[in-house]
């Protein structure tokens, strides 16, 4: 229910769910559903009812790699397999190229690259064996601190929500008690007004009867005088 003296956009909510009763009474749910259905029938949104919103930019977070993958999926092309050539160690050339220095040099360079790659992997494994355990412990401790902080924030939010619910409940119960008292006063005033009006009507009838009696007595006196 909107108030008449309110700022535009403000609404006075006259529902007191913590105080009102009768929601579970037979027919209440059906009546509410009927009101909702009636509102949905009267509300006919147009095709451009979202025209006041800005046009969505679906490509805001797209990258070139994502765009290429979307195009590949749209064209129903199979995914390109990873090249494993860099991990292969081909044998030295044979046949006509067994005396080709360039071919031998490529084979040696590939072998050196593979050897260096394996050496780096070994170093990484050694570093992991020395420091990986402590690094993992530190990482887990950071996760524990983050979880504890998040749980504290969650407890604060829950307490804030509970306090708001209690405040709302107290406000509604107070308002409901005042409304009930005002309703009782209104009923009492209406009853008193009814009694006053009935008494006034009775007095008016009595006055009318007295006037009639006085009028008849005056007429009788006049007749006797003549």
Curated annotation (Swiss-Prot):
Domain of life: Eukaryota
Residues the record lists as N-acetylalanine modifications: 2
InterPro entries reported for this sequence: SPF27 (IPR008409)
GO biological process: mRNA splicing, via spliceosome
Keywords on record: Acetylation, Coiled coil, mRNA processing, mRNA splicing, Nucleus, Phosphoprotein, Spliceosome
Cellular compartment(s): Nucleus; Nucleus, Nucleolus
Residue(s) carrying Phosphoserine: 94
A Gene Ontology term for the protein's cellular component: nucleolus
Coiled coil: 139-223
Pfam family name, one: BCAS2
The protein's assembly and partners: Component of the pre-catalytic and catalytic spliceosome complexes. Component of the postcatalytic spliceosome P complex. Component of the PRP19-CDC5L splicing complex composed of a core complex comprising a homotetramer of PRPF19, CDC5L, PLRG1 and BCAS2, and at least three less stably associated proteins CTNNBL1, CWC15 and HSPA8. Interacts directly in the complex with PRPF19, CDC5L and PLRG1.
Main function: Required for pre-mRNA splicing as component of the activated spliceosome. Component of the PRP19-CDC5L complex that forms an integral part of the spliceosome and is required for activating pre-mRNA splicing. May have a scaffolding role in the spliceosome assembly as it contacts all other components of the core complex. The PRP19-CDC5L complex may also play a role in the response to DNA damage (DDR).
Similarity section: Belongs to the SPF27 family.
Protein name in the entry: Pre-mRNA-splicing factor SPF27
Organism: Pongo abelii
